[in-house]
Amino acid sequence: NRGGGLLDPKNHFILDLRQPLLDKGNVDVLSEINVEAGWECTTCQACTEVCPVGNQVEKSDEIRRLEVLVEGKVPQEYQKLFMNLQESGNTEGRTDSPLADRLPTFSPDKEYVLWLGCFARYELDPNFTKSVENFANILDVAGITYGVLENEHCSGDPANRLGDKLTYNMLREHNMEQLAHASKVVTLCPHCALNLEKEYAKYSEVNYDVSHHTQVIAQLIEEGRIEVKKGSNGKVTYHDPCNLSRMLDEVDAPRTAINATTDEFFELEESGRNTLCCGAGGGLWWKKETTGRTHLVRAEQVVNSEADTVVTGCNFCYGMMNQGLKPLTPEGRSEIQVKDVADLVSE
């Protein structure tokens, strides 16, 4: 609710249920909580991270699952999203991908599946396409073989977080078949990485290893397989993606890569596992603006930090930073550059 939204996790998901449970012993969850506020949860797990008694407050997707599967209630903004996922296997209802067409196709003799995800595959932020190509170039320079799947579907993250478990399992089963001959998967999307590695494993055995692209880049730097030069990006800071830092517990690899490219790196006010959510998780990227979003709070922190460049390791964070910084950058000040870790290293 730092962005001005309705959601207050402690009150809406814990205290609103405590007294009715004490009074009645058994309650109808949907009648006792503010369901509208539940749809604003980004599932970033910040509330769980700081909860002193370890309540898993972030499990709002369970509340949304009740709304979707039991009540059949889906906010209008998500109805088209669910239809696209069910009919086309991706969030945008697309069948074409110019980016995928330009990249090598995966075959079992290649080391990595380069998993694009819907954001990159269908260019939800066209600027991010260059980040994917920069990472592919890094792999080429290091002599690593890779390819994209011809029939990659959405990892299912939006359906999973928004409560549509039937659609999620349909996507999961399809992707598991597509990955049957893969031993290693690398992706620029922490949301996809989380699902491909940890969420899928809740349903069936996963026979491939999943890496985030910053982990691969950091390893290549440490092994001396790529030469990285200091760039001219001015003062550089890093926005930790929630899925990467909290859910995948990766905060070191991006910094290893960034520090190889600059001597002017500094931390933001909230960083590491204590990062501030960009506001796009939990399917909210596809939700129309209602009240506020935390990406404006985060963008203001970046502006006030006097950074020249803000780096991130997530496609959604990349898009939200671009959206948030433009209206908040003071007139007369140079535009703050938003870059992926791969962009810095590729330069």
Named regions from a protein language model:
Residues 1-7:
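Non-transmembrane accessory domains of multi-pass membrane transporters/channels
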Residues 109-110, 208, 233:
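Sequence-level motif detector for i,i+2 pairs with an aromatic at +2
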Residues 121-212, 243-347:
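Cofactor-cradling patches in redox/metallo enzymes
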Residues 218-235:
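Acyltransferase donor/substrate-recognition loop-hinge adjacent to the catalytic core
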